[in-house]
Amino acid sequence: PQTAEAIWTLVRDGGYRCGWGEGKGSCFYRFTEPKRPGYPHMIELFAKCPDFLKGREGIDVAPIHVDENISSLSAILLDDAYYSLFLQGIRTVGGVSVLGTEYIVPFKAKAYLDLKARREAGENVDSRKVKKHKRDALRLAQLLGESEGVDLRGELKDDMLAFVKDCEVGDVNLKQIGVAGATMVQLLETMKATYGLIG
């Protein structure tokens, strides 16, 4: 409740316009065009509860388009297992809450798997957006050797295993996506070790 109140105070005081998109139980909020200087030009939120907006006076709500990346990520965050992983991975750096690299990779992997499945099912999903998540995960995997391991279980582990297997048969040119000094085999072995996928 305190966090929600702080968010709404920021939105109200900044004079933001409010937009929202909702589908399949997911809720995404975007606040733009603050009237007061010094406020972030955009705030984006993923809400676990669709009633987040209810009872808020002085907030105008208008529908916005939610693209594949946003709807996929919001759906992931609304999944209890991924939401718990998200909370587990938050750390504070210089007073700012950030998500550790070892926690970002599973989200990128899941977004890739979801968008790929939707595209294969016939949905109109841009192939470039599908590939982007995979490439992002592989770029970030270069940093996993410096991170502590994350013990993934259940669907989280299954999804990461599926991503690793997909990469094993894929044709990503690592040099072209900015990965230097590591082979695909080395990256995938690092992932397996980081996320407890060995054995």
Where are the model-predicted features located?
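Compositionally biased terminal segments of proteins
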Residues: 1-199
